[in-house]
Swiss-Prot record:
Keywords for this protein: Aminoacyl-tRNA synthetase, ATP-binding, Cytoplasm, Ligase, Nucleotide-binding, Protein biosynthesis
Residue positions of motif 'HIGH' region: 122-132
InterPro entries found in the cross-reference section: aa-tRNA-synth_I_CS, Arg-tRNA-ligase, Arg-tRNA-synth_N, Arg-tRNA-synth_N_sf, ArgRS_core, DALR_anticod-bd, Rossmann-like_a/b/a_fold, tRNAsynth_Ia_anticodon-bd
Organism: Enterobacter sp. (strain 638)
Subcellular location: Cytoplasm
GO biological process: arginyl-tRNA aminoacylation
PANTHER family: ARGININE--TRNA LIGASE, CYTOPLASMIC (PTHR11956:SF5), ARGINYL-TRNA SYNTHETASE (PTHR11956)
Protein name listed in UniProt: Arginine--tRNA ligase
EC number: 6.1.1.19
NCBIfam families xref list: argS
SMART domains linked to this entry: Arg_tRNA_synt_N (SM01016), DALR_1 (SM00836)
GO MF terms held by the record: arginine-tRNA ligase activity; ATP binding
Primary enzyme class: ligase
Assembly behavior: Monomer.
């Protein structure tokens, strides 16, 4: 049930009947304060200006055409021409009841699209670090939301599995296998990469061999392809452990690395030349873009092939967008890549559009995000100033959560404690990130993220168990409430019901904007409203059975909404804390 969409349609019809153009924007929003009703329509001012009418006069005319019978019990004009809409308690009650009868809590499915989501993208032969965390968990929350809404989502893990470094890595892997006379487990990927680089920098013969291996690998030599595959397999197996720990839905089947697009690159360069988009410049192949200027104010040159014949990331990204449209048949492509890559992506996509590889009707969206900072406001590092490994971060989260849970539950059996600590620790790391607007940098702070107050995972997980405890105390089976009526007589009941019915609107925003923090804010607000409702509207000691059962149903929908909302974020819920 999308009340905002329903009201937008009704207000739009009334505006048109009052003389507004057919494309007028009703601007229906959720009200910020209860005294302004549940929704406000703010579109009158803009339309009044176009029509040359006083806004309040137009608002009064709109009201004569506005049919909200059975939806709102009060509609009033406020200020210069805002229309405040108060939802009818009977309307709220019937839709709460309908939501409880639906597995999807009454959430409708929009027209299904094929949506490619590019996220995570670690590098081969390197261990995942905290820099991969934001793309991985924000992208996965978007994927879960889009899938819940019924879209066909193609996860694209654009791993760095190609490039000149593979000559060096294969040469070192070969050396290790010869010296160790057997299979080598790349347990320490960082160490392996570091040692390979050291050999490359200090041993001229090794470096020469590495360079020759690049040529052989790129030429498709089977031995070198096999060595390359081994490096990719070992890396992705290790990454999968991190994905599993993070409760992220990526699997090996979602890997679409840079190597996938490599065979397309010569054809793309030739095609861009044929279309007169690319030209030779100082031995390299360059696309000059009028949309971007260099320091001299001239069109910026984007290199797509170097003098030595090598290709660049831009060339790969052009091929990648083309592949996603032509082969994967994407209706929309979302890229969860940090904000520093914005200009690079925009330039690649400008070339893609000019070449006609992806039509304008297919959005290419950079859902960029800021950096993860330490308490000092600088990039998050180890005490020694190194990069924080993702596995170390998750280990610490688990250890801190274990101590926290044990302190609050000294008698909890070890197995249950471990399960709860995992849900709280991993949930805390993810939620701390997801609850911030992704476009900004955010401060990583253990104390804040593991707090049981405020907009945190432990608070949200606790809020969920608190709602469930009502049913344990009532000693009632939820199915016994199926035929009970929802009756809304108190303001707190109405406020909670209205917020519960805004779940679909929240999902719609997350799906459209790729902003999971909107869902976090909604769930936090919902938990707060339930708290006020629980305090002021006695459930188990209600005046009569009708009120008791009705309030239990509001509690039931609150629990289901919290659980489903947290699930779209990839945050695990627990039954007890």
């Amino acid at each position: 049930m999308n009340i905002q969409a329903l009201l937008s349609e009704k207000v739009s019809q009334a505006l048109i009947a009052a003389g507004a153009p057919a494309d007028c924007e009703p601007q229906v929003r959720q009200s910020a304060k209860v005294q302004f009703g549940d929704y406000q329509a703010n579109g009158v001012m803009a339309v009044a200006k176009k029509l040359g009418m006083p806004p309040r006069q137009l608002a009064e005319l709109v009201l004569t055409h506005l049919d909200l019978n059975g939806i709102a019990n009060k509609v009033e004009i406020a200020g210069p021409g805002f229309i405040n809409i108060f939802l009818d308690p009977a309307f709220l009650a019937s839709h709460v009841d309908a939501a409880l009868k639906s597995e999807r809590l009454g959430v409708a499915q929009p027209k299904a699209e094929t949506i490619v989501v590019d996220y995570s993208a670690p590098n081969v032969a390197k261990e995942m670090h905290v820099g991969h965390l934001r793309s991985t968990i924000i992208g996965d929350a978007a994927v879960r939301t889009l899938e819940f809404l019924g879209h066909k989502v193609i996860r694209a893990n654009h791993v760095g599995d190609w490039g000149t470094q593979f000559g060096m890595l294969i040469a070192f892997l070969e050396k290790q296998q010869q010296e160790n006379a057997g299979e080598m487990a790349l347990a320490d990927l960082e160490g392996f990469y570091r040692e390979a680089k050291k050999h490359y920098d200090e041993d001229a013969a090794f470096a020469e061999r590495a360079r020759s291996y690049v040529v052989k690998l790129q030429g498709g030599d089977e031995y070198f392809r096999e060595m390359w595959r081994k490096l990719v397999d070992i890396t992705m197996s290790q990454n999968q452990l991190a994905y599993n720990r993070l409760n992220v839905t990526l699997t090996r089947d979602d890997v679409m690395g840079e190597s996938l697009y490599n065979p397309m690159l010569p054809g793309i360069v030739a095609d861009l030349k044929a279309k007169k988009l690319a030209v030779e410049s100082e031995g390299a192949t360059v696309v000059f873009l009028d949309e971007y200027k260099n320091k001299e104010g001239e069109p910026m040159g984007v290199i797509i092939q170097k003098k030595d014949g090598g290709y660049l990331y831009t060339t790969t990204d052009i091929a990648c967008a083309k592949y996603r449209y032509e082969t994967l048949h994407a209706d929309r492509v979302l890229y969860y890549i940090d904000s520093r890559q914005h200009q690079h992506l925009m330039q690649a996509w400008t070339i893609v559009r000019k070449a006609g590889y992806v039509p304008e009707s297919v959005p290419l969206e950079h859902h960029m995000f800021g950096m993860m900072l330490g308490k000092d406001g600088k990039p998050f590092k180890t005490r020694a100033g190194g990069t924080v490994k993702l596995s170390d971060l998750l280990d610490e989260a688990l250890e801190r959560a274990r101590r926290l849970v044990a302190e609050k539950n000294p008698d909890m059996p070890a197995e249950e404690l471990e399960k709860l600590a995992n849900a709280v620790g991993i949930g805390a790391v993810k939620y701390a990130d997801l609850s911030k607007n992704r476009t900004t940098d955010y401060i990583f702070d253990w104390d804040n993220m593991l707090a049981f107050e405020g907009n945190t995972a432990p608070y949200m997980q606790y809020a969920y168990t608190r709602v469930l405890s009502v049913f344990r105390k009532a000693n009632i089976d939820e199915s016994a409430l199926a035929n009970a009526a929802v009756v809304i007589t108190e303001d707190r009941e109405a406020q909670l019901a209205a917020r519960l019915l805004q779940f679909e609107e929240t999902l719609t925003v997350v799906a459209r904007e790729g902003t999971p923090h909107v869902m976090c804010s909604y769930l936090y607000d919902l938990a707060g409203l339930f708290s006020g409702f629980y305090e002021h509207c006695p459930i188990l000691s209600a005046d009569n059975e009708e009120a008791r059962n009705s309030r239990l149903k509001l509690a039931q929908l609150t629990a289901k909404t919290l659980k489903l909302g947290l699930d779209t974020l990839g945050i695990e819920t627990v039954e007890r804390m």
